[in-house]
Amino acid sequence: MRQQYDTSAPPAAFSVADAFMLRTALDALGGVRGLDTLDVACGHGSTARLLASGGARRTVGVDSCPERIRRARAHETGETGEAGAVEYHVADAAGMPQLGPFDLATAVYLFNQAHDRVALHAMFRAVRANLRPGARLLAIVPNPGAFPHVDWSPYGIRIVERTPGGDAPLLRARLETDPPVAFECREWAHADFAEAAVDAGFATVAWQPTRTPPACEIRDEPYWARYRSAPVSSLMNCVA
């Protein structure tokens, strides 16, 4: 989803939850200090900057959209015109070149963009090919089966239509921003992601429990409890 909706607007609740879940997972692993890190489908670079600011030895961001990479680089250089801490590349995830090896890769809403099973498996293989043995992939992926049973609009996203067909149903959705932003993705099952990861050479695949930020005045604990009962996403943890 990120590839299609990355904007400069304040983050929606589901995006805030995603960022918290990813940071929590990174902290549980001991952080990224001294690691070589890769962020695939980096968008405007928020996760890549998180990795760099955490002390990664090297951080590389990859995205298929030249404009998103341009904006990510612009954010890095700022007004000084100096090179930033993140190295950015324009590349399609399924055909990503050898940029590593890396100790850690992150992918936020990458794999749901695969239009068929061939592309899905190619994405996982390209990520695995850039990782050292024992390295880790942390991927945030959408949860399937929500439409039409779950309303995610209070958290910033609405599924509008689900069309069966192909290797996975096509979802038409929109971000509840002002103005709304429409996007499409595929509704892959968790088992499809796991199968592709194992096929790519990952030794283990695990799923992290959903975690949400502490309650605040804007989003209290009942709000987050409702979110946890039917979360937008899950965190996939794969070891090479």
What are these regions (language model features)?
Residues 121-133:
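A short glycine-rich, Lys/Arg-flanked "PGG" loop and its adjoining helix->strand segment in the class I
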Residues 196, 200-240:
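C-terminal lobe and adjacent flexible extensions of AdoMet/dcAdoMet transferase-like proteins
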